[in-house]
Amino acid sequence: MLDIQQIQQIIPHRYPFLLVDRIVEVEEGKRAVGIKNVSANEQFFVGHFPEYPVMPGVLIVEALAQVGAVAMLMKEENRGRLAFFTGIDNCRFKKQVKPGDQLRLEVEMIRFKGAIGKGKGIATVDGELVCETEMMFALGEK
């Protein structure tokens, strides 16, 4: 399990754009599971939407990408590098995410060749699917 400080040692994201609170499972270079506790105080709720706060779907996908980056960058040969988000395929949103929800973010690497990878991401709240997607990554130097 990784806490927020340990996550920040692996990926460069910081508040307000760090969208993972902790990693609860990880297999280096293969898969990871993260948790995001969605607070009513999230900055994006100020404008999305003031009378009906809903977490933007693109930020759910970004949270999945951050979990995938942790999995990839924990692999010994990738430590100290950056993971760049390069594409999204087959993305579907099934349910809204609101203040008070806890997002479970699961990412499994499907393919990894050289510096390019592809992962499948699933986000759930209380066991219900809210988002599924395939994401592409490229590893680069800082």
Swiss-Prot record:
It comes from the Bacteria. It catalyses: a (3R)-hydroxyacyl-[ACP] = a (2E)-enoyl-[ACP] + H2O. It is an enzyme of class 4 (lyase). One of its GO terms (cellular component) is membrane. The keyword Lipid biosynthesis applies. Involved in unsaturated fatty acids biosynthesis. Catalyzes the dehydration of short chain beta-hydroxyacyl-ACPs and long chain saturated and unsaturated beta-hydroxyacyl-ACPs. This is 3-hydroxyacyl-[acyl-carrier-protein] dehydratase FabZ. The gene is fabZ.
